[in-house]
Amino acid sequence: MSNIEKQAGELQEKLIAVNRVSKTVKGGRIMSFTALTVVGDGNGRVGFGYGKAREVPAAIQKAMEKARRNMINVALNEGTLQHPVKGSHTGSRVFMQPASEGTGIIAGGAMRAVLEVAGVRNVLSKAYGSTNPINVVRATIDALANMKSPEMVAAKRGKTVEEILG
């Protein structure tokens, strides 16, 4: 139990959006809340969660729990990306490219939160199409998951890392 608490303590958690939703029934409307969160260790691990409950704190707690269970590893290169990447989910498309030291995170809203908790310090990015936070987060994580490290590319091509990096 203490190991889990320690691990959770080193994760950065960010709340991206809280939304009130309603279900219409015969007797009127039933209100509930949704929460979108991202968690990351600031060193290449990131995950997102979407929770729904009758109360805001419960929705946030559910979202955080789902985010911790739904984490992926991202191969970063000294605080930036390995190469330009594209990602998409439904109507949202994102494009991200590596940036030199000192550039910072040039990204908007939901995409910025994902990149911050993932440990990316320098990146240029743009979201196209729908800017719905849930879809932008999914598209960003899709792009990060599709990023290949030089070691992976070298192994696939049967070359050395030095040949790949030029």
Curated annotation (Swiss-Prot):
Q: Which Pfam families match?
A: Ribosomal_S5 (PF00333), Ribosomal_S5_C (PF03719)
Biological processes annotated in GO: translation
Q: Which InterPro entries match?
A: Ribosomal_Su5_D2-typ_SF, Ribosomal_uS5, Ribosomal_uS5_bac-type, Ribosomal_uS5_C, Ribosomal_uS5_N, Ribosomal_uS5_N_CS, Ribsml_uS5_D2-typ_fold_subgr
GO MF annotations, alphabetized: rRNA binding; structural constituent of ribosome
Q: What is known of its domains?
A: The N-terminal domain interacts with the head of the 30S subunit; the C-terminal domain interacts with the body and contacts protein S4. The interaction surface between S4 and S5 is involved in control of translational fidelity.
**Assembly information from the UniProt record:** Part of the 30S ribosomal subunit. Contacts proteins S4 and S8.
What protein name does the entry list? Small ribosomal subunit protein uS5
* Species this protein is from: Actinobacillus pleuropneumoniae serotype 5b (strain L20)
In the UniProt record, the gene name given for this protein reads: rpsE
